[in-house]
C-alpha cells in the first residue's frame, strides 16, 4: 500500500487545496491530510474546526483521512508508514521555499517530497488572501466549499462584533 501525507494549515481549506488533495488521492492508496499545528500562529479557525471542514470537504474520497500533527512532518510520515510528502505548488516562490524543506526532509529521514503543480484556475489562491478579501466584503464564494464559505463569513461577523 502506498501512502502520502498532504500537509498544510488549511485555515481555511480552499478549492485549490481540494483540487490537489483529489489529484493526489487518485495516485495513492491512502492520503493523510494533516493540519500542521503552529502554536506561534493564531488561526481564524481552531485545529478541530479545520479538521471538521476538511473531513466534510473530502468525504467523497474514501482513501483520504484527516489528522493533525505538532512536530516535524517527516517524523509523522515515518510513524504512519507514509512514503511521500505531497505539496501543491502555485508558482516559483512556493518552489523556492518548498525545495529547501524537501531536501531537509529527505536528508533527515529519507522521505521524499513530491510536488504537484496547482491547477492554473487556483494558482492565485491562498487561505490568507481569501480571509483578507472576505474580511473587506469581497466575494470569495467560488474559492471555497459552500459550508466553509458560510463558516468563514460567520467567523468574520463574530470577530467584527467582538471588536465593535
Curated annotation (Swiss-Prot):
ATP binds at residues 9-10, 17, 88-90, 98, 122-128. Pathway: Cofactor biosynthesis; coenzyme A biosynthesis; CoA from (R)-pantothenate: step 4/5. Its cofactor is Mg(2+). It holds the Pfam family CTP_transf_like. GO terms for molecular function: ATP binding; pantetheine-phosphate adenylyltransferase activity. Its main location: cytoplasm. Its EC number is 2.7.7.3. This is Phosphopantetheine adenylyltransferase.
Amino acid at each position: 500500500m502506498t501512502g502520502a501525507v498532504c500537509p498544510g494549515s488549511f485555515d481555511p481549506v480552499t478549492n485549490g487545496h481540494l483540487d490537489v488533495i483529489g489529484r493526489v488521492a487518485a495516485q495513492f492508496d491512502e492520503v493523510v491530510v494533516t493540519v500542521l499545528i503552529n502554536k506561534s500562529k493564531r488561526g481564524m479557525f481552531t485545529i478541530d474546526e479545520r479538521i471538521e471542514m476538511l473531513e466534510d470537504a473530502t468525504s467523497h474520497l474514501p482513501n483520504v483521512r484527516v489528522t493533525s500533527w505538532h512536530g516535524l512532518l517527516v517524523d509523522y510520515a515515518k510513524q504512519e508508514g507514509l512514503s511521500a510528502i505531497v505539496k501543491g505548488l502555485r508558482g516559483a516562490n512556493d518552489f523556492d521555499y518548498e525545495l529547501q524543506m524537501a531536501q531537509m526532509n529527505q536528508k533527515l529521514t529519507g522521505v521524499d517530497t513530491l510536488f504537484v503543480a496547482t491547477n492554473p484556475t487556483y494558482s492565485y489562491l491562498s487561505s490568507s488572501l481569501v480571509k483578507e478579501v472576505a474580511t473587506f466584503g469581497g466575494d470569495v464564494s467560488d474559492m471555497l466549499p459552500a459550508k466553509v464559505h458560510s463558516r468563514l463569513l460567520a467567523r468574520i461577523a463574530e470577530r467584527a462584533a467582538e471588536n465593535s
